[in-house]
């Protein structure tokens, strides 16, 4: 199942004969075999080579041991790409409003994002350390990060994730 907010016990009622039903949350990058796939199963002896091997073709597969995290996972994994798209969209609008060509601004934002993704993929550094490695005290990046902090950007992201969690709970009618 990839239904947001629907618990495995509820889904299982539609398939009473099936013993091994898994709950999935995945994201759009599966279209390019680069997705994040999270699964949970009531059956504890999942044979990953047999039962979920096809999922590995779509991206990285992770098992969670408790279904209680699925609303959070839905918000982060399922909605996560939209967060990044919205950030890029906002940066592009700013670039265009400051005089850059729309096509050119998309190209340089795309390459910046892809390059940044490759750094994340190829290092064990945490996000804070990576951000700090780009941020020179008193520099342009520092000014931008300071502005984001003053506007409580982290709190805005936190509240946005919580709103997505709340929506997932509403979809399952659980409070």
Residue locations for each model-derived region?
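Rossmann-like dinucleotide/flavin-binding elements
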Residues: 30-32
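ADP-ribose/adenylate-binding Rossmann-like module
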Residues: 1-6
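Active-site glycine-rich loop that binds ribose-phosphate moieties when present
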Residues: 23
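Alpha-helical membrane segments and immediately flanking helix-loop junctions
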Residues: 76-77
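Internal alpha-helical scaffold of NAD(P)-dependent oxidoreductase catalytic cores
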Residues: 10, 14-20, 36-72, 83-124
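NAD(P)-dependent Rossmann-like dehydrogenase/reductase catalytic/cofactor-binding core
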Residues: 110-175
């Amino acid at each position: 199942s990839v239904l947001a907010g629907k618990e495995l016990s509820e889904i299982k009622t539609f398939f009473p004969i099936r013993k091994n039903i898994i709950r999935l949350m995945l994201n759009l990058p599966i279209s390019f075999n680069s997705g994040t796939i999270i699964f949970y199963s009531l059956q504890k002896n999942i044979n990953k080579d047999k039962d979920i091997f096809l999922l590995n073709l779509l991206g990285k597969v992770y098992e969670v041991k408790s279904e209680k995290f699925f609303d959070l996972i839905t918000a982060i994994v399922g909605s996560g790409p939209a967060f990044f798209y919205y950030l890029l969209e906002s940066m592009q609008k700013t670039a265009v409003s400051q005089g850059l060509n729309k096509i050119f601004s998309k190209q340089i934002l795309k390459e910046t994002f892809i390059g940044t993704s490759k750094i994340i993929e190829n290092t064990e550094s945490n996000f804070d350390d990576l951000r700090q490695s780009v941020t020179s005290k008193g520099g342009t990046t520092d000014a931008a990060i300071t502005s984001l902090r003053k506007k409580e950007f982290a709190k805005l992201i936190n509240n946005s994730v919580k709103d997505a969690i709340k929506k997932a709970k509403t979809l399952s009618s659980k409070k």
